Amino acid sequence: MFNRQKVLDRLTNHKPYINGSEYMRRAAVFIPMVRKDGEIHILFEVRASSLKHRPSEISFPGGGIEEGETPLQAAIRETQEEIGSYPEDIKIISELDLLITPVKYIIHPFVGYLDNIEHIKLNKDEVDHVFMVPLSYLLENQPKRYFNTVQVLPDQNLPFDLIPGEKNYKFENGKSQVLFYKYKDYVIWGITAKILYNFLEFFED
């Protein structure tokens, strides 16, 4: 039986996160800022064409968070594994807003400086090449916006008799914004564009 003290013991010092996170996949990414020609650039990867998931797409360094690993540790580890940067060249400034994707990914983005890019040695199994975009260009060129419909398709084994309206119950649909940035022959879209947009919002007047 729970009394007042037991309730306090369970709830005190609880750190809120995301309800249902235990059923979601977790990942972390690093937004690398590079100083080049007196201007800040953002470094992007073009994923290898041989990858099973999202081949040839543009992304930030990053990947899944392993057991016992913090999101920050995962972002740094994945950056080292993918582009070969030295740990001391990765200077994290801040964590940005969490991104929850429609397919139940929790993504922890971090932003910081990547120094000494001459140390980069790409893991060609994962990364075809990298390129950089001036921060000023991204701030001056707004993305194109589109909206996908996210629809609930209920399991036919649901106990509809327990739901008001039963099989006539109207499940809500939602909208998921899809952003597209173009730079030269590159198209930055999807998850990467959403994370980028959140980062760029910090520099709006």
Whereabouts are the PLM-identified features?
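Acidic, glycine-rich loop-and-strand cores that form catalytic or ligand-binding grooves
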Residues: 120-157
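N-terminal leader/linker segments that precede catalytic domains of diphosphate-processing enzymes
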Residues: 1-59, 63-109, 113-114, 136, ...
